[in-house]
């Protein structure tokens, strides 16, 4: 009897919750890291938690090419990158494609982040109108959508005043 393996299901295209499998997850005593790099010879993680040492935290390869490791003492808010040695021996420092947060430009590191927000909109959620049909959703890349006249980028807080979300009309 086959056992369900979430990583294999993701590789096969039948698991749509990859954000639960990969990335950095803060735990009480440190952070667990997980990244898919099936052709890598080795994968390390470095960051603020080890003064960006390139040899401090080696990850272990699983049979599906998923590399995992735990960094004691690492915590939310710290920056990190993966150091990936390719099959050809080349070494690249990469941001985490499943990171929940990232460093502000021009930096490119990922940021350890938690999703521990206590939502208080229960009353609003209970009273909202249910959407009974298709919706159009427009997406823009906020980092490149608009700039100040001097060429600098807007912060998220500056962009908030420009965003308009409207309720559907019937």
PLM features: residue spans?
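Residue-level detector of conserved catalytic or cofactor/ligand-binding positions
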Residues: 161-169
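Beta-strand-rich interaction surfaces with strong enrichment in secreted/lumenal proteins
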Residues: 56-59
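Hydrophobic pocket-lining residues within nucleotide cofactor-binding pockets
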Residues: 40, 145, 168
